[in-house]
UniProtKB/Swiss-Prot annotation:
Belongs to the phosphoglycerate mutase family. BPG-dependent PGAM subfamily. The gene is gpmA. It comes from Methanococcus vannielii (strain ATCC 35089 / DSM 1224 / JCM 13029 / OCM 148 / SB). Catalyzes the interconversion of 2-phosphoglycerate and 3-phosphoglycerate. One of its GO terms (molecular function) is phosphoglycerate mutase activity. One of its GO terms (biological process) is glycolytic process. Keywords: Gluconeogenesis, Glycolysis, Isomerase. It is an enzyme of class 5 (isomerase). This is 2,3-bisphosphoglycerate-dependent phosphoglycerate mutase.
């Protein structure tokens, strides 16, 4: 048996300001820090063997705050891709084997919003028209100017899920993934076999853990974790 936890980052400063964020590296708001700490307390008894995150600071910071509250897991250590960083990142000593590795990847980044990034959503409607902005936000295949559609996001997140995250889970490792609304939406669409209409209705709340469990029968959704237990409703 193994647990797989998905966590959208806590509220960012631009979430609070209703601004298209995408790949802009915006930090958490004070409310987002609080959300991440609450998530950490809810997950305090989960012993995570491996962590995955996007490369954006709001997701990484959420992971760090969660793991600070976690009582069962080891300290985290980012595993780097480059040869030099791997060498410089080596930790020597008896405690080095006890770190929980963190793998960060751009494939888990938020949907790239192109020319919408940095625009207040109401201002974007004034510039491009509310119908086009609605279409870009709520269609599966239509992308904003110079940006990604949700389908484009799916086509980079799901291969990463298959190549790295799911194999780790099948080895019996407990995994946490901190990412973003649209990158997680596309991953969950794959796991839940949602069609293009269903995935557009899927809303991923900030800072609320979504827990899956893998056993001999396969991967099963337990639901969103809260103080009372699990809420299994997805859409």
């Amino acid at each position: 048996m193994a647990n797989l936890v998905f966590l959208r980052h806590g509220e960012s400063i631009w979430n609070k300001m209703n601004i298209f964020t995408g790949w802009v590296d915006v930090p958490l708001s004070k409310g987002g820090v609080k959300e991440a700490k609450i998530a950490g307390k809810l997950l305090k008894s989960y012993k995570f063997d491996v962590a995955y995150s996007s490369e954006l600071i709001r997701a990484l910071n959420t992971l760090i705050l969660v793991m600070q509250e976690n009582k069962a897991s080891n300290f985290i250590k980012i595993n780097h891709d480059s040869v030099k960083m791997k060498e410089w990142g080596k930790v020597y000593g008896a405690e080095s084997i006890n770190y929980t590795p963190v793998y960060k990847s751009w494939e888990l980044n938020e949907r790239y919003y192109g020319k919408l990034q940095g625009l207040n959503k109401e201002r974007a409607k004034e510039i491009y028209g509310k119908d086009d902005v609605f279409l870009w936000r709520r269609s599966y295949e239509t992308a904003p100017p110079n940006g990604e559609s949700l389908k484009d996001t799916y086509e980079r997140t799901v291969p990463y899920l298959k190549r790295y995250i799911l194999p780790t889970l099948t080895y019996g490792k407990d995994v946490i993934v901190t990412a973003h609304g649209n990158s997680l939406r596309s991953i969950i669409a794959y796991l839940e076999k949602l069609n293009s209409e269903e995935v557009l209705k899927l809303e991923i709340p900030t800072g609320v853990p979504l827990v899956y469990n893998l056993d001999e029968k396969g991967l099963k959704r337990l639901g969103y974790l809260n103080k009372k237990g699990f809420d299994n409703e997805l859409i």
